[in-house]
């Protein structure tokens, strides 16, 4: 019986990863797998010669205090810096912020960043214990134009969501063409789009910027306002530039999008997402009205740029009529929230082209609020960390050779445009095959 109890005890110890001797602080008695790097955060790109700011959280999941420890930081398995800490109490986590100097000899390119223990409680480990947390860091030598993206969840039934509209408008006004807003409307909205992934966004309203870090309020941000947060992510160097073209097909049921991505680095882990957004979306039915909890308050009791929603002001009703901008209405995401657009590998100083045909929505509750001359395609280029490396936005134009795009002007048929067989417009009649566009749309 004693033997059975002994083996049962040993089995239990093994399952729980408990040290055999609680008073022994040697490395052998500590299960390194229970010392965890819970978070690892840093910019996805820096310039050549710049230092790399790094934030990480270390958690001591053992039953013993860690008196001291040393970790190495690696880029492509080359040690670039070392950090030493002490006094990690059992069952506690600690946040560490450091600046890692990067050798100027490291050239432009993409590097894998890892972190690993080399010493614990004064003992040097025979084998470096590396964390499973890894990041890709790009080092670039050229400053490229940067476009930042806010992805926000909002809803017309959310009474606090009007401040998200203001936050997005503030970013648009300040950053102009360097800002892209993407508003993902919630369930029961006529603008609800179920295919869009909203990882990390749980409360209404909330947003992410360039898909970096945690979610935040789209108006207050995490510091002194959303503008400060956006300025911070805009400081991260871009590794690519994106140019974009988008046109409707003949009956505006599809949009053909073409993006050209010029890259500073070689990369096989980048992807591209196409998102269609609508501006000035409106319908006079009740289900399009925006809820507004700020209507409970007097103008003097709310912040200056929220006064428009206070009692007695322009939008001081609950609910109120509103024209919505930056609304997601279609994308390259499928029903399973899987991105269907593809991107070939990027080459240093090379250009890669991506094509995608996006189906426009057909649900009448949504389409009756769409203004087809206020529709845009956004191309988001995603790096290996899942963050937006750069983006572009373009107004969707009509297919100039598309027969269905012409409005009927009179009952009598007449030629209003001529095109060559290559689709280019010609000014007058000439010998050879021509495509004629008539005033009745044929």
Question: Which stretches of residues belong to each language-model region?
Answer:
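Bacterial Sec-dependent N-terminal signal peptides
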Residues: 1-29
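C-terminal tail/sorting-segment detector
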Residues: 5-7, 433-442
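Residue-level detector of functionally pivotal "anchor" positions at catalytic/ligand-binding pockets or at interdomain
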Residues: 25-37, 139-148, 393-425
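Local sequence-structure signature of Cys/Sec-based thiol-disulfide redox active-site neighborhoods
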Residues: 140-177
């Amino acid at each position: 019986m004693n033997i059975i109890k002994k083996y049962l005890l040993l089995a239990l110890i093994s399952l729980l990863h408990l040290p055999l001797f609680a008073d022994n602080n040697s490395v052998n008695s500590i299960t390194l797998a229970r010392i965890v790097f819970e978070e690892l955060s840093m910019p996805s790109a820096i310039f050549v010669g710049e230092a790399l700011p790094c934030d990480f959280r270390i958690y001591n999941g053992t039953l013993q205090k860690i008196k001291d420890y040393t970790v190495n930081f690696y880029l492509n398995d080359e040690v670039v810096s070392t950090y030493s800490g002490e006094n990690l109490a059992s069952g506690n986590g600690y946040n560490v912020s450091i600046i890692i100097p990067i050798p100027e000899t490291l050239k432009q390119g993409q590097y894998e960043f890892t972190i690993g223990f080399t010493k614990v409680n004064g003992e040097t480990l025979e084998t470096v214990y590396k964390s499973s947390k890894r990041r890709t860091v790009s080092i670039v030598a050229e400053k490229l134009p940067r476009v930042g993206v806010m992805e926000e969840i909002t809803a017309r039934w959310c009474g606090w969501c009007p401040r998200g509209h203001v936050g997005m408008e503030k970013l648009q006004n300040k950053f102009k063409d360097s800002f892209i807003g993407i508003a993902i409307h919630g369930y029961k909205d006529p603008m609800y789009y179920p295919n869009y992934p909203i990882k990390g966004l749980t409360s209404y309203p909330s947003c992410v910027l360039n898909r970096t870090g945690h979610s935040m309020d789209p108006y207050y941000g995490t510091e002194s306002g959303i503008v400060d947060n956006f300025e911070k992510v805009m400081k991260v160097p871009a590794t690519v530039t994106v140019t974009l073209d988008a046109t409707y097909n003949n009956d505006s049921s599809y949009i053909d999008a073409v993006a050209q991505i010029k890259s500073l680095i070689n990369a096989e882990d980048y992807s591209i997402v196409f998102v269609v957004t609508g501006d000035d979306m409106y319908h006079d039915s009740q289900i399009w009205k925006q809820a507004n909890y700020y209507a409970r308050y007097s103008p003097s009791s709310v912040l200056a740029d929220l006064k428009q929603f206070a009692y007695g002001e322009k939008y001081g009703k609950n609910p109120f009529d509103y024209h919505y901008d930056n609304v997601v209405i279609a994308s390259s995401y499928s029903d399973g929230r899987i991105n269907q657009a593809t991107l070939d590998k990027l080459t240093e100083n090379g250009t890669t082209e991506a094509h995608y045909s996006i189906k426009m929505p057909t649900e009448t509750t949504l389409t009756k609020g769409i203004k087809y001359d206020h529709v845009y395609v956004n191309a988001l280029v995603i790096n290996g960390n899942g963050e937006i490396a750069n983006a572009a936005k373009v107004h969707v134009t009509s297919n100039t050779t598309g027969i269905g795009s012409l409005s009927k002007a009179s009952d009598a048929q007449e030629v209003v445009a001529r095109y060559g067989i290559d689709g280019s417009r010609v000014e007058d009649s000439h010998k050879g095959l021509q495509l004629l566009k008539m005033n009745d749309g044929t």
